[in-house]
Structure formats: structure tokens, C-alpha cells
Amino acid sequence: MNIIRAKTAGFCFGVDRAVKLTYDLLADGHKVATLGPLIHNPQVVEDLEAKGALTCPNVASVPDGYEVIIRSHGVPQTVYDEISTRRLAYHDATCPFVAKIHKIAMRADENHALLLVAGDASQDRKSVV
């Protein structure tokens, strides 16, 4: 049997970027709250919470004085609007590749084009489209 070991392992670029941003902000003394778990990795989420990050289910539950971290898969425009209404500072950790897909979807909508997205509509990565 021939065993081939992967050259790399770990998070994808977008998730790694979001995790690093959050750890850096916490290390600099910022009060941060993520909208839902930052990533789908309970050990990392627990470590972030142990360092002071809050995991909030929505913008309304973010305490005053906390900075919001937008997760790597992004959020719908309505969430940005809620953050603005509450005048909360935020850090957008949306993966650039995901943001590109969001722009394509918005352009399709503006042009009244039919946009088909396959998968579970309630899944957080697809529900923003």
C-alpha cells in the first residue's frame, strides 16, 4: 500500500483570514462579537470565546461597545443595514471569493436574470445569495 501525505492541511484561505483577524483583534484588546459561530469548528470557537469573543445569534444581541465580525461566508445586505442602524463598528471577514459570488448574484438580480442556486436554502452560505 502506498500512503500519500497531503502537503497542506487546515482552513481554507477565507476561513483562515477570518480566524486570524479575530485573534488579532482580541490580542489588541478589542471587544468582538461574531454573528453565529465564526467557523464550523467547535474547538476554535471555544478558544475564541475563552479569549473574550462573544458568539451572538444576530445583530440585536450584540452588546453596545462590541465590534462585529462578519464571518467568511458573508451575510445578507439586511445585516449590514442592522449594523449601520445600531452604529456598531464591524470587520468584514467575508472571503473575497464568496464576495465575488455575491456580486455576480446581485448583478443577475439587477438584470432580472434567473439565478439558480442548488443546495439547502437555509444553509448560511447559500442564504446570503
Locate the predicted segments by residue.
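Short acidic low-complexity segments
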Residues: 54-63
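Short internal beta-strands
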Residues: 31-38, 117-119
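N-terminal beta-loop-helix "entrance" segment that forms/cooperates
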Residues: 36-53
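Generic N-terminal amphipathic, Lys/Arg-enriched alpha-helix
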Residues: 1-10, 28-31
